[in-house]
Amino acid sequence: RRQRQMCIRDRAMPFPITVMDHPSSRNFPLNGYKGQRGSAGRENIDYTLHKEGINIGYRYFNTVNRPVSYPFGYGLSYTEFSYDNSVVKATGKGFKASIRVKNIGKVAGRESVQLYVSAPAGGLEKPACELKAFAKTKLLQPGESEILIFNVSDYDLASFDESIQSWVSAKGKYIVKFGASIED
């Protein structure tokens, strides 16, 4: 049963349909035994073991295509925005991206734009896509637009390779997406 009544103050995490949708729920400490904090030989009752690797939070739900009540970045607005004229250009140390955001609604508003990147397949394990940058428009009047600029470095694209104890970026084609949430 889906229940979606919730007050969301900020947009920092996805809300699963049930807590059991989180892979770490199998490792939640409160599984019937309510021991004492700091008991010798037992994990602290507040301890949760995360075995999902790099796919924690929105990365997990997006990578395995599991539906959520509120996707990462979800938010409400009194107006509507359109995105167009996206440009992505490689730089010597990553890439620069820009997008035009236009208020197509009837009232003034601000839009939080998120930039997601999907890495090339192969090599190290990577989520389906990752948030790499975000920006917020100024207060846009109806019909007004603004161009937002994002700079993403090679370091932002890198993953830690334990076998060589170093940060590495995958070679190949990266896919860049803009949206107000991960589902846009």
Predicted regions and their residues:
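Secreted/periplasmic carbohydrate-active enzymes, especially glycoside hydrolases
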Residues: 159-171
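Secreted, periplasmic, or luminal enzymes acting at the cell surface/secretory milieu
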Residues: 1-5, 9-110, 116-118, 126, ...
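Sparse recognition of residues in long alpha-helices and their boundaries
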Residues: 114-115, 159
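Intrinsically disordered, low-complexity Pro/Gly/Ser/Thr-rich segments with frequent PxxP/GP/PP motifs
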Residues: 123-162
